[in-house]
């Protein structure tokens, strides 16, 4: 879900071409959830193979990753590890919301209301370990780097970006900024036309670039104050934040208070200072490799077509596109190296 500070954050629309040659660390769980939510049939049922196993996420990962590679982007997917203990309440809340949405989905189906059914089906989306392992396997077969975070994937992606190993972190959530990512790319995996909920209207969704330094300059605060602001309005670790405090009021509080959390700690059932410390110093690892390899053609065909009933013709076409994108990327890198070497 992430922290609700979007109204305060300056951001600008960009084209995929603006990210040409850039390495991007993508929040894998966030992307998988998006694919599972959006790649569905009219009644909200996800794509499945002949054995009833969900494949929406595999379709999304395969074709969207190829699109990114064709745009000259080098994607790496960062997977979540163990969540912090104080996230348990939010995870339980999400589970209950999914169960309620699933009941409403079935009710809408029984009434023949397909639009309502699809809406609730999206809200009922859940990601289990099997879906994650399938996603990892596909990405490895495609030659795409995967990184296993010790805890939050967004924290690991932000760390990689802060080191300069990648250009930016990619996620729909703004938490990456709290974790210190110098740049955040939103809408990277959902770019294109999307239907507005409840309306027969389609809108064009484009990637957005959010630069941490520009955010802090616009709000006239430090990153530490941005974290305090987020805690006041609510994060995944203290859902809902402080009652009655929205983003604008929280901004005013953190600007003029040396220790804005002190006043509200007494009325909170979680340690607000522990949450702040987690954002400042989350568990991360240096054990990762950013190496893009040739795809395993036979492995991809076996996994997607033989095991999950994907169209062999479409998958073969996708593999060819992927190979061309990798070759073009290497050629571009070689040419830029020679340009730099010229006297």
From Swiss-Prot:
Region (N-domain): 1-98
Annotated cofactor note: Binds 2 magnesium ions per subunit. They probably participate in the reaction catalyzed by the enzyme. May bind an additional third magnesium ion after substrate binding.
Enzyme Commission code: 3.1.-.-
Binding positions for Mg(2+) 1 per the UniProt entry: 27, 80, 152, 154
Sorted UniProt keywords: DNA damage, DNA repair, DNA replication, Endonuclease, Exonuclease, Hydrolase, Magnesium, Metal-binding, Nuclease
Cofactors, names only: Mg(2+)
Molecular functions (GO terms): 5'-3' exonuclease activity; 5'-flap endonuclease activity; DNA binding; magnesium ion binding
HAMAP family with a match to the protein in the record: Fen
Protein name: Flap endonuclease 1
Pfam families hit by this protein: XPG_I (PF00867), XPG_N (PF00752)
Record-stated family: Belongs to the XPG/RAD2 endonuclease family. FEN1 subfamily.
Gene3D superfamilies in alphabetical order: 5' to 3' exonuclease, C-terminal subdomain, 5'-nuclease
Residue positions binding Mg(2+) 2: 173, 175, 236
Region of interest called I-domain, as start-end residue ranges on this chain: 116-258
Keyword check for Magnesium: yes
NCBIfam families (UniProt xref): fen_arch (TIGR03674)
Gene: fen
Protein role: Structure-specific nuclease with 5'-flap endonuclease and 5'-3' exonuclease activities involved in DNA replication and repair. During DNA replication, cleaves the 5'-overhanging flap structure that is generated by displacement synthesis when DNA polymerase encounters the 5'-end of a downstream Okazaki fragment. Binds the unpaired 3'-DNA end and kinks the DNA to facilitate 5' cleavage specificity. Cleaves one nucleotide into the double-stranded DNA from the junction in flap DNA, leaving a nick for ligation. Also involved in the base excision repair (BER) pathway.
Residue span of region Interaction with PCNA: 330-338
GO biological process: DNA repair; DNA replication, removal of RNA primer
Complex and partners: Interacts with PCNA. PCNA stimulates the nuclease activity without altering cleavage specificity.
Organism: Pyrococcus horikoshii (strain ATCC 700860 / DSM 12428 / JCM 9974 / NBRC 100139 / OT-3)
């Amino acid at each position: 879900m992430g922290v609700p500070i979007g109204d305060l954050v300056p951001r600008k629309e960009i084209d995929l071409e603006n990210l040409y040659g850039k390495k991007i660390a993508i929040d894998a769980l966030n992307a998988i959830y998006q694919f599972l939510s959006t790649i569905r049939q009219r009644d909200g049922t996800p794509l499945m193979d002949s054995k009833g196993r969900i494949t929406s996420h595999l379709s999304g990962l395969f074709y969207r990753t190829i699109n990114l590679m064709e745009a000259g982007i080098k994607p790496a997917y960062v997977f979540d590890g163990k969540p912090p203990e104080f996230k348990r309440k939010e995870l339980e809340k999400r589970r209950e919301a999914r169960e309620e949405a699933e009941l409403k989905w079935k009710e809408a189906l029984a009434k023949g209301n397909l639009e309502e059914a699809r809406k609730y089906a999206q809200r009922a989306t859940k990601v289990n370990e099997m879906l994650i392992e399938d996603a990892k396997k596909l990405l490895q077969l495609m030659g795409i780097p995967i990184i296993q975070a010790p805890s939050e994937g967004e924290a690991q992606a932000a760390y990689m970006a802060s080191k300069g190993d990648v250009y930016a972190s990619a996620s729909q959530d703004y938490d990456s900024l709290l974790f210190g990512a110098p740049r955040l790319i939103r809408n990277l995996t959902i770019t294109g036309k999307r239907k507005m909920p409840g309306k027969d209207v389609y809108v064009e969704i484009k990637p957005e670039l959010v630069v941490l330094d520009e955010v802090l300059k616009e709000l006239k605060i430090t990153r530490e104050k941005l974290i305090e602001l987020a805690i006041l309005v609510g994060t995944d670790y203290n859902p809902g934040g402080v009652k009655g405090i929205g983003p604008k009021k929280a901004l005013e509080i953190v600007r003029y208070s040396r220790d804005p959390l002190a006043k509200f700690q007494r009325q909170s059932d979680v340690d607000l200072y522990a949450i702040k410390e987690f954002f400042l110093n989350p568990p991360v690892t240096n054990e990762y490799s950013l190496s893009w390899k040739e795809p395993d053609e036979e492995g991809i065909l076996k996994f997607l077509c033989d095991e999950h009933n994907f169209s062999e013709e479409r998958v073969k076409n996708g593999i060819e596109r992927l190979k061309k994108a990798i070759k073009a990327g290497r050629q571009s890198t070689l040419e830029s190296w020679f340009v730099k070497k010229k006297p």
